[in-house]
Amino acid sequence: MLFDLFRAVAAARAAKALHPRGAVVAGTLVRHGTRPGTGVAWIDGTGVDEVLVRFSRGAGLPGPLPDVQGLALRSTSPGGAPVDVLLATTLGRRVPFPRRGTTGVLHSSIAAYRAPSGPLLLGARSHGPGFLLASAAPRGPWRPFAELHLRDDPARAQDAPLTFEPVLNAAPGLEFPSSWRRLREPAYAGSRAGRARGPAH
């Protein structure tokens, strides 16, 4: 059912079912790590990664209206594998919530990953012209592990045909719960199929 629903919406829009339009900018992720560690090298270790970041609005509503703000990040693991992280503005940590912008508001992974240290959320919050990335146990404090520096102003950037795969491209050591994968995978597959199909004539 999710596959068919997302395929129909994506075909009607000729775009992603959710977050149909966005702005893609390049950036640099400066990872300074965390202690105690989570068992995930991409979070615990230090490094500098070249990244792509896509900012988008969940329902695709016009700018003046509140919408769920999306922040999608493509980075690279210490072993060279792609790492995709999808974050959205939330009420608390787990409920998607519309906002007018990204300044001063939390973006969360919503679902907690499985990590060697236990369930782990990823989050981001604006920090100067960029963002601060952090991890947290579901009821624990946010612990910053990286700074995201953007090279361009997202308000002036164009979209790009990127497909983020947060389930397939999770950082080594992170894994989505099976219940979340069962929801995400047909939804993402349906959205891809709908975009390939395009609107009916």
What are these regions (language model features)?
Residues 1-201:
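Active-site-adjacent core segments of small-molecule enzymes
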